């Protein structure tokens, strides 16, 4: 996927 950092932030936001 593009924007690995964004994906990480999204997961953190979910938590």
UniProtKB/Swiss-Prot annotation:
Keywords: Disulfide bond, Fibrinogenolytic toxin, Hemostasis impairing toxin, Hydrolase, Protease, Secreted, Serine protease, Toxin. The keyword rRNA-binding does not apply. Expressed by the venom gland. It is found in: Secreted. Inhibited by PMSF, bovine aprotinin (APR), soybean trypsin inhibitor (STI), and high temperature (85 degrees Celsius). Is not inhibited by EDTA, and beta-mercaptoethanol. GO terms for molecular function: serine-type endopeptidase activity; toxin activity. The keyword Secreted applies. Its EC number is 3.4.21.-. One of its GO terms (biological process) is proteolysis. GO terms for cellular component: extracellular space. Monomer. Snake venom serine protease that cleaves fibrinogen Aalpha chain (FGA), partially cleaves Bbeta chain (FGB) and has no activity on gamma chain. Is less potent than A1 and A2 alpha-fibrinogenases. Belongs to the peptidase S1 family. Snake venom subfamily. This is Alpha-fibrinogenase A3. It comes from Crotalus atrox (Western diamondback rattlesnake). The lineage of its organism: Eukaryota, Metazoa, Chordata, Craniata, Vertebrata.
